[in-house]
Curated annotation (Swiss-Prot):
<dbReference type="GO" id="GO:0009234">
    <property type="term" value="P:menaquinone biosynthetic process"/>
</dbReference>
<dbReference type="InterPro" id="IPR029061">
    <property type="entry name" value="THDP-binding"/>
</dbReference>
<comment type="pathway">
    <text>Cofactor biosynthesis; phylloquinone biosynthesis.</text>
</comment>
<dbReference type="GO" id="GO:0042372">
    <property type="term" value="P:phylloquinone biosynthetic process"/>
</dbReference>
<comment type="function">
    <text>Catalyzes the thiamine diphosphate-dependent decarboxylation of 2-oxoglutarate and the subsequent addition of the resulting succinic semialdehyde-thiamine pyrophosphate anion to isochorismate to yield 2-succinyl-5-enolpyruvyl-6-hydroxy-3-cyclohexene-1-carboxylate (SEPHCHC).</text>
</comment>
<keyword id="KW-0808">Transferase</keyword>
<dbReference type="InterPro" id="IPR032264">
    <property type="entry name" value="MenD_middle"/>
</dbReference>
<dbReference type="Pfam" id="PF02776">
    <property type="entry name" value="TPP_enzyme_N"/>
</dbReference>
<comment type="subunit">
    <text>Homodimer.</text>
</comment>
<dbReference type="GO" id="GO:0030976">
    <property type="term" value="F:thiamine pyrophosphate binding"/>
</dbReference>
<keyword id="KW-0479">Metal-binding</keyword>
<dbReference type="GO" id="GO:0000287">
    <property type="term" value="F:magnesium ion binding"/>
</dbReference>
<keyword id="KW-0786">Thiamine pyrophosphate</keyword>
<dbReference type="Pfam" id="PF16582">
    <property type="entry name" value="TPP_enzyme_M_2"/>
</dbReference>
<protein>
    <recommendedName>
        <fullName>2-succinyl-5-enolpyruvyl-6-hydroxy-3-cyclohexene-1-carboxylate synthase</fullName>
        <ecNumber>2.2.1.9</ecNumber>
    </recommendedName>
</protein>
<keyword id="KW-0460">Magnesium</keyword>
<dbReference type="GO" id="GO:0030145">
    <property type="term" value="F:manganese ion binding"/>
</dbReference>
Length: 586
């Protein structure tokens, strides 16, 4: 690329774009504004960066988060000065909490135009509090060689900090004086003749991969403790690994070395690679609702991989067990919300397996009697689930998750909205071999940005699916504005039960008023008309066969809303009755 020497702001911005491109940046999301003009021009004209204009900053940030999560590389977000950057905040929180790399470039007025009512100026320094992995305000643009080198190296460091030691957001606040347009300045243009671009960027390359492993002594200490325990348990929580197969194989190998069962959350890829792990338990939430069985299955040791599953039943049971726990995760967060007897092991499960000596991998423990008890209970509950779902001809919310686990095209990317969908996935998603790719925002667990994140996940991806409730979709309708530049296909399965169905499952539902108006928040939006407004295809699903037909095959482009109308109270009653049947059956 040729740097832009038309003026100091354009040179400054083009060095930012070129440095990040050489490091591996492929996507920049640009929100409209004047102060960010130099950055917008630099990214828009870069031949190796896809620059995507997005009107709404909140939607833009979640869209970028979806792309970054899928690619495993940072995405740049650009906005103008003032309140624009504040709209990035929810996605910044989610990115920090769930470990997604983002580079936030907020343009700003120069220091002399701040705190003096100059207009469109707020305090943007440390705008996102403690959430960024790193944050800095850049110096004002300069053509001095030392300042250009400073800019390049700051970008290199920002790129690194967004990925190591733990991925997350990085914020660069970038002040500009006029001119903001690429107006020619002869003094700056004259630098082009003597500027050696190749030498300037000679040391800028993508980061080398790093594999972290445990030292042999620590590994052996842990293994000796684990292999001496015949009531051990592995718990695999929500996970979106870059290479799901390697992740699943690592957990399967650990389970077979120890002879321990694996409780796998529905948001873990383990349930979609079930052929890799014969010790898989998917119905733990339903099993543990039986107090007698729950007492019999108390563990002595637990290896918890990543965040805990969503299940409150599981969390209460673990708290009561007071088992010695090892939390395996590269994150520097406190990963123990139960405040138990836990030891943090700051490594990936793949790194843990790499650390285990080959000799110990070859001498696997036999399946424990404890593990067999789990597997027997799991078989009984799975049989009950399948029998109940096969008999269920009426459209109910819970069957959607069960059916999708079996009928989606292989390797389909599936974004699962928060609230009730993630819980039904945990209860009813069946283990299989379709290698479905689950995506979700379980860092802060909010419903904001649902559609925009799903669109980011599916951008330039194979045909994808979003499973969402009506309120989560309506909360992010600005995401539909992304269609002009988004490329791909997204089928949006909307459970329309006229409000927040999850609250029907909570104790507050017995207190009406104020429950109906202030918690369930009924809505009467006609999704058919909403789809027409944004030129999306819409279909009202009439039966389970109709749903299966609509998903096989998935279209190759555009948006398709599949509305499934459900009765909220009926769905709640069905779950309660079925949960009681599970307790009785064990």
């Amino acid at each position: 690329m040729t740097l832009d020497f038309r003026n100091v702001n354009m040179l400054w911005s083009s060095i930012i774009a070129e440095t990040l491109s050489r490091l591996g940046l492929t996507t920049a999301i640009i929100c409209p504004g004047s102060r960010s003009g130099p950055l917008a021009v630099a990214f828009a004209q870069h031949p190796d960066i896809e620059a995507i204009p997005v009107l709404d900053e909140r939607s833009a940030a979640f869209f970028g988060l979806g792309i970054a999560r899928r690619k495993g590389l940072p995405v740049v977000l650009v906005c103008t000065s003032g309140t624009a950057g504040a709209n990035f905040y929810p996605a910044v929180i989610e990115a920090e909490a769930s470990g997604v790399p983002l580079l936030l470039l907020t343009a700003d007025r120069p220091p002399e135009l701040r705190h003096c009512q100059a207009g469109q100026a707020i305090d943007q320094v440390k705008l996102y509090g403690h959430y960024p992995r790193w944050q800095v305000e850049l110096a004002l643009p300069s053509t001095h060689p030392e300042m250009l080198a400073y800019l390049r190296q700051t970008c290199v460091y920002a790129w690194e900090q967004s990925q190591r030691p733990v991925p997350g957001p990085v914020h660069l606040n970038i002040p500009f004086r006029d001119p903001l347009a690429p107006i020619s300045d002869l003094e700056t243009e004259s630098l082009a003749a003597t500027f050696d671009i190749d030498q300037f960027f000679a040391a800028v390359h993508p980061l080398p991969s790093v594999q972290i492993s445990l030292d042999l002594q620590t590994t052996n200490v842990y293994l000796d403790q684990w292999m001496s325990c015949d009531r051990g348990l592995i718990i695999a929580g929500p996970a979106q690994p870059d290479t799901p197969e390697h992740y699943c194989l690592a957990i399967a190998q650990l389970a077979h070395i120890l002879g321990w069962p694996v409780l796998a959350e529905g948001l873990s890829p383990l349930r979609n690679w079930a052929d890799r792990n014969s010790y898989l338990i998917s119905t733990y939430d339903l099993i543990l609702r039986n107090p007698t069985i729950a007492s019999q299955l108390q563990p002595q040791q637990v290896i918890s991989i990543g965040a805990l599953p969503t299940s409150k039943v599981l969390r209460v049971w673990l708290t009561q067990s007071r088992a010695q726990t090892w939390v395996v995760d590269v994150s520097d967060h406190n990963m123990d919300p139960l405040h138990g007897l836990s030891i943090p092991v700051r490594i990936s499960v793949e790194g843990l397996i790499t650390s285990i000596p080959a000799a110990k991998k070859e001498h696997c423990q036999p399946l424990t009697a404890y593990a067999k008890s789990w597997l027997n209970a799991n078989h009984s509950v799975r049989t009950l689930i399948n029998r109940a779902m096969q008999k269920q001809s009426e459209l109910i919310e819970s069957k959607i998750a069960w059916l999708l686990s079996q009928i989606l095209p292989p390797r389909t990317p599936l974004f699962i909205a928060n609230s009730m969908p993630v819980r039904d996935i945990e209860y009813f998603w069946q283990p299989g071999t379709l290698h479905i790719q689950p995506y979700f925002n379980r860092g802060a667990n909010g419903i904001d940005g649902t559609l925009s994140t799903a669109l980011g996940m599916s951008h330039r991806q194979q045909s994808s699916v979003l499973l969402t409730g009506d309120l989560a979709l309506l909360h992010d309708t600005n995401g539909f504005l992304l269609q002009d530049y988004w490329q791909g296909h997204l089928t949006i399965i909307v459970v329309n039960n006229g409000g927040g169905g999850i609250f029907q499952m909570l104790p507050i539902s017995a207190f009406d008023p104020p429950f109906e108006r202030f918690f369930r928040t009924p809505q009467q939006v006609q999704l058919k008309h909403l789809a027409a407004t944004y030129q999306a295809k819409w279909t009202l699903i009439q039966s389970w066969a109709h749903l299966q037909q609509a998903l096989n095959p998935l279209p190759e482009s555009g948006l398709h809303i599949l509305e499934i109308s459900c009765d909220c109270q009926n769905d709640t009653q069905w779950r309660r009755i079925f949960f009681k049947e599970c307790v009785k059956s064990l």
